[in-house]
Amino acid sequence: MSTNMDLAEMKDPAPVREKEHEHFRTDHLLANIGHRAVSGGFVTVGAQAAKFTLNFLAAAVLARLLDPRDFGLVGMVLGVTAMVQVFSQLGLSIATIQRETITQAQVTNLFWINVGFSGTLAILSAALAPLTAKFYHDPRVTAVMLALSVTFVITGATVQHQALLTRQMRFPALAVIDVTSAAIGFGLACVMAWRGFAYWALVAQQVATATCSLIFMWLTSGWRPNLPSRNSGVKPLVSFGAHLSLADFVGQFSANSDSILLGRFFGASPLGLYTRAQVLLARPIQQIITPINNVLIPVLSRLQHDADRYRRSYMRAYGTLALIVFSFAAMCLALSKPLVLVILGPKWAGAIPLFAMFTIVAISQPLSAICSWIYESQGRGKDQLTNHTAAGLVTIASFVLGLHWGPIGVVTSLAVVSLIIRLPIVYYIAGRSGPVKTSDLWMGFLSHLPCWVGVFLMTALAVRLLGHHSNLVQLLICGPAGLIAGSALFLLFPRPRESAFFAAGKVSGALKTRFAK
């Protein structure tokens, strides 16, 4: 009798079972999910502001310590590894976040699948390094690709810990990890660039950031995997993740085809100008999307059976993002010259027209990318794959169409095609089922266009009036002046005004809640 009881306790010890349950249960989040979403968003926005400052400093410092060809060389390799990196996650982080109930055995098996597949990808990447160097006609690519292949394994071992923290809406912890890891990577890159390590500073930044994220995720999460087990019911999760992974691969392949084509046919220096112009605009926008993304997917996943609340939550987030992205893109277009020269320096003047065209791309791409919130929160992996495939083919076609004219031809073609072909396709697929319809997405997009028009006109007018002043003065005065004056114009329209008041109310409420504690 005693032996049987001991065996039962060993198989299912209550303390262990209770401890494991803490990592997976989400029922306690539903009672105040709105407050958690706003509070989490507030914390994450603060972290992104800190990360934005870091990235601004990194862009300014590294652009002066390194040459365009250094960024171009690493950009060549990242164009390839970014596509392979998708499979290190296999879409299994979203599978863990989106699932209503999940077990220790399931997450354990997902962890080992991530690690095993990541190791395989690292070996494959290392094997392909010499061929990639031949493709680019640059022998330096081999060593860079070998070094960056290490990040596959690091990322694979981080996926499930990050997913569990997101599932539990532990946004402050995620924010601290994100900023701290980025700061360490940036610091190392600056030291190495200053010491003359050239492009290796950028490689070290990638590896250091990923390694720090791994260490901090493991320490913060507290979750530890067991050995793999059979019959855990993990097959549906892997199936869902496979669709997401394929969709992400198609998306990454199309998104990085420009870097691959430009690196192959035009070399490292033109690609360096292109990637810096792209990153200078895309990174701040990504840091705007990231806090909303981190908060909204878990929230929408919990609301997937409440159509009215789901649609309302999504469209409010859409309106807030449209307001910010349109205003930011318009301001950047009017300030293209002073922005590039102040942040990157005079030797990057060739990036000014590229940066200006990327602001046109920014009108449509972020607001098509966030359709992934719909697919991931509703478990529509097949639809996401269809979406990414159709949009990816259109994007690659735009790159090929503009390649003859070099970097400026590629980005101009992308801007036009994204707006008139890609966006309609994406909105049709996203809205053909579920609470959010295609008409909702178009209404959200078109009703917020006055934000872009108002801010651009007012900022451009300010630049024209102060054009005789230095670039720094134009940046410091014309940007805020154009944003304030433009806001006064677009607030005359009901939808932008509603989005602005909603966002302001949420921020005000979060501030009051935090300072009341």
Language-model features: where?
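N-terminal membrane topogenesis motif
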Residues: 1-56, 94-97, 101-112, 139-142, ...
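Transmembrane alpha-helical segments of multi-pass transport proteins
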Residues: 3, 10-22, 124, 390-394, ...
